[in-house]
UniProtKB/Swiss-Prot annotation:
Domain Radical SAM core: 101-345
Reactions the enzyme catalyzes: adenosine(2503) in 23S rRNA + 2 reduced [2Fe-2S]-[ferredoxin] + 2 S-adenosyl-L-methionine = 2-methyladenosine(2503) in 23S rRNA + 5'-deoxyadenosine + L-methionine + 2 oxidized [2Fe-2S]-[ferredoxin] + S-adenosyl-L-homocysteine; adenosine(37) in tRNA + 2 reduced [2Fe-2S]-[ferredoxin] + 2 S-adenosyl-L-methionine = 2-methyladenosine(37) in tRNA + 5'-deoxyadenosine + L-methionine + 2 oxidized [2Fe-2S]-[ferredoxin] + S-adenosyl-L-homocysteine
Name the record gives this protein: Dual-specificity RNA methyltransferase RlmN
The keyword DNA-binding appears for this protein: no
Annotated family: Belongs to the radical SAM superfamily. RlmN family.
The record's free-text note on cofactor binding: Binds 1 [4Fe-4S] cluster. The cluster is coordinated with 3 cysteines and an exchangeable S-adenosyl-L-methionine.
Pfam families to which the protein is assigned, alphabetical: Radical_SAM, RlmN_N
Length: 379
């Protein structure tokens, strides 16, 4: 544990670290050195930072720390998907998932413990909202995953270029609504993009939002990365039921915001995510309606087979119905993919493991036991 006055350096992007070093009487280049040690060499303390002046290392030892999130469990699926459960205190946990593919490795990162948006089909929303994650807790997920994966492959830490990097893409699609934690998410994404940290391109960092229109505009002005929008319905009446935020920012406003974002986006399309729910939003008529509502937004569709959980009362669309729905979109000339289900054997659907932790914690509170996260592993 660190002292109450200790500063966690993982909370700083480049600008913040320069300012912090300045407060110690140090020049800006020291911040770059420090950032490389932390994010490229995986340094956990200051003694090994040999190109820093000893006087600076001593200053840092008394004032700063590098504190990573605590890993509660680490699960590896038979298909190679790897999922970490991160303990963020007070019985709360978030999830980080790595999805390996032949030409890339994608890390799905969480931004909040729980979620206040409360989409009907999302198990995270049913847990309620606990708190925003800090920048350190967000970028810490990438730092933890990158170096754990490198170690498993026998690759040493260090800025060894793209050939050595395991995580090639980051998607802010884990637990929480990223744009409702803007002040912590944006510095974390700046570190993802920084050549003195993880060096990802803007095209390889994707933020997924349920449609917080004012913050979409702000993101476009300040840090336009690739954008995905959780759409899930082709009209306001249905989307009001599935995504309650739609009552505040209806489809007309959302589509206009998407058009504005595309003027500055690193990609020339928006990805619309669409959870396929049997008998709710999956008819061919819904698909045609979807084409109409998105007609002025260059886009592609990512159809997501629903991951059932007991409280939802919803059922996954049948494979043949998903295929028919997709064909309507494809026939209209829109690129459409169906998300492949990954990591079923380790509950890799977002929110499932953390939801189990939440349930155990609530049970412990009722029975008077300590609310400690219990490690569980796939067998």
């Amino acid at each position: 544990m660190t002292s109450e006055t200790s500063v966690n350096l993982l909370d700083f992007d480049a600008e913040g670290l320069v300012a912090y070093c300045g407060s110690l009487g140090e020049k800006p280049f020291r911040a770059k050195q420090l950032q490389r040690w932390i994010h490229q060499y995986n340094a956990g303390d200051f003694d090994g930072m040999t190109d820093l002046a000893k006087s600076l290392r001593e200053k840092l030892k008394g004032r700063a720390s590098i504190v990573m999130p605590d890993i509660a469990s680490d699960h590896v699926s038979t298909d190679g998907t790897r999922k970490w459960l991160i303990d963020v205190g007070n019985g709360n946990a978030v999830e980080t998932v790595f999805i390996p593919e032949e030409t890339r490795g994608t890390l799905c990162v969480s931004s909040q413990a729980g979620c206040a948006v409360n989409c009907r089909f999302c198990s995270t929303g049913k847990q309620g909202f606990s708190r925003n994650l800090s920048t350190a807790e967000i970028i810490g997920q990438l730092r933890m995953a990158e170096f754990a994966l490198r170690a498993s492959l026998g690759r040493a830490p260090g800025p060894n270029g793209k050939a050595e990097r395991v995580v090639t893409n980051v998607v802010m699609m884990g637990m929480g609504e990223p744009l409702l934690n803007y002040s912590a998410v944006v510095p974390a994404m700046r570190l993802m993009l920084d050549d003195n940290a993880y060096g990802l391109s803007r095209r390889r960092v994707t933020l997924s939002t349920s449609g917080v229109v004012p913050m979409m505009d702000r993101l476009g002005a300040e840090l336009p990365v690739a954008l995905a929008v959780s759409l899930h319905a082709p009209n306001d009446a249905l989307r009001d039921e599935l995504v309650p935020l739609n009552k505040k920012y209806p489809l007309r406003e959302l589509m206009a915001a998407c058009q504005r974002y595309l003027k500055v986006a690193p990609r020339d399309f928006i990805t619309f995510e669409y959870c396929m729910l049997d008998g709710v939003n999956d008819t061919e008529a819904h698909a045609r309606e979807l084409l109409a509502v998105t007609r002025d937004v260059p886009c592609k569709f990512n159809l997501i087979p629903f991951n059932p959980f007991p409280e939802s009362g919803l059922i996954r669309s049948k494979p043949e119905q998903i295929k028919r729905f997709a064909q309507v979109l494809i026939d209209a000339g829109v690129v459409t993919t169906v998300r492949k289900t990954r990591g079923d054997d380790i509950d890799a659907a977002c929110g499932q493991l953390a939801g189990a932790v939440k349930d155990r914690t609530r049970l412990a509170e009722r029975t008077g036991a300590a609310g400690k996260i219990i490690e569980v592993r796939a067998v």
